[in-house]
């Protein structure tokens, strides 16, 4: 049975905050199969994700920066010093493959490449039941064309990265990759 849990942190140190949020999200879950991470543009996102990976090594972790804060079951989480939220998913039958890439010169081709990499990471040769995608604003449709050329039409969810001033300072991250 699918279970989910959420953790967050407003610690000033990005690495410590990433670790704290990831550990809190994993509480009570047998085996975390995927971790969605959303954080502040004020953090060094490479450091934040380093803390996440330290807390939950070998768990596919991915996400993006968020506009001024995140919403959790406990309410709105934000801080001038930074914030991070994580949602852990756990299910014995879950197979997760995560992949990411910089835009490149052809976002349709990038989407195709990322879909193939994610399927390989999940150990799957068939289309997933659903997928998640986050991208920079105005590029999502191009990536989706490339992804759907590989896996066909399957349900998906996700969104666009953001920053506090919508000026292009947003970040996307997956494992140890930051864009």
Positions of predicted regions on the chain:
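Cofactor- and metal-binding active-site motifs of prokaryotic enzymes
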Residues: 1-179
């Amino acid at each position: 049975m699918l279970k989910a849990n959420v953790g967050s942190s407003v610690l000033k140190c990005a690495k410590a905050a990433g670790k704290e949020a990831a550990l809190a999200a994993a509480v009570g879950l047998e085996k975390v199969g995927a971790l969605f991470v959303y954080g502040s543009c004020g953090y060094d996102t490479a450091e934040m994700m380093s803390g996440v990976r330290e807390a939950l090594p070998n768990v596919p972790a991915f996400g993006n920066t968020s506009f001024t804060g995140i919403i959790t079951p406990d309410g709105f989480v934000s801080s001038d010093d930074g914030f991070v939220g994580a949602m852990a998913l756990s299910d014995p039958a879950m197979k997760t493959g995560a992949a990411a890439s910089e835009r490149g010169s052809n976002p349709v081709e990038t989407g195709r490449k990322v879909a193939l990499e994610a399927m390989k990471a999940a150990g799957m040769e068939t289309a997933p039941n659903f997928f998640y995608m986050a991208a920079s604003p105005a590029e999502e449709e191009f990536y989706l064309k490339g992804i759907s050329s590989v896996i066909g039409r399957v349900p998906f969810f996700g969104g666009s990265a953001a920053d506090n001033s919508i000026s292009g300072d947003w970040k996307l991250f997956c494992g140890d990759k930051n864009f």
